[in-house]
Amino acid sequence: MSDDAVKQMKQVVAKAAADRVQSGMVVGLGTGSTTAFVIQFLGDRLRKGELSNIVGVPTSFQASVLAKKYGIPLVTLDDVEKLDIAIDGADEVDPAKNLIKGGGAAHTREKIVDSLAEQFLVVVDSSKLVQKLGSTFPVPVEVLPFAVAPVTRALKALGGEPELRMGVKKDGPVVTDQGNFVLDVRFDDIPDPAELEKAINNIPGVVENGLFVNVADVILVGEIVDGQPQVREIFH
């Protein structure tokens, strides 16, 4: 599939998500390429007067920068107890609406923000749909730098193949917004995502992992049908 087709899918699904936000809402702003379009479209709606009195809770420095660029007022979790909606992307979505997230190394903040939302809305293009989690994407695990070696051993004992995520435009490991490292862990099979999510988080030194199980309310999928981008909704 061409880059242009993927961009079209991301834009159409992002607009559909932004259109669900109503005036007065507290909105969780996710991280990633598709969610970046959501933030842009929310800014467009504010500028046109279609929306008013919304505030955003960013899940990352990237989301914060984009929200400021497009004129979305921001608050922190010190200011709000709950959110009306959180909109976020995913790296994989299985038929049970379970997710792998964390390609942008923001999954810890995303999981916190998404858990506080009345509705957690996930936006993806069709390439992110898989039959089983772990098919194409490793499970990201945020880990304290001090604990990388013991956590690596513990993840191997769970059947994983951990690899320290390295920077692309800088030498050395990727550092999260919290100042931690990320281990990308491949598993041959994830028969029970809920159990694996708990098992990983029980390892001392792990901050959070990218398995999001039984938390997504609605998945919006951007896809190309007969040459045209359109949106499909999954909510069962």
Curated annotation (Swiss-Prot):
Metabolic or biological pathway: Carbohydrate degradation; pentose phosphate pathway; D-ribose 5-phosphate from D-ribulose 5-phosphate (non-oxidative stage): step 1/1
CDD domains referenced in this protein's UniProt entry, alphabetically: RPI_A (cd01398)
Keywords linked to the UniProt accession: Isomerase
Annotated residues for binding of substrate: 31-34, 88-91, 101-104, 128
Domain of life from the UniProt record: Bacteria
Reactions catalysed: aldehydo-D-ribose 5-phosphate = D-ribulose 5-phosphate
A GO CC term assigned to this protein in UniProt: cytosol
Role this protein plays: Catalyzes the reversible conversion of ribose-5-phosphate to ribulose 5-phosphate.
Name of the featured protein: Ribose-5-phosphate isomerase A
Protein source organism: Thermosynechococcus vestitus (strain NIES-2133 / IAM M-273 / BP-1)
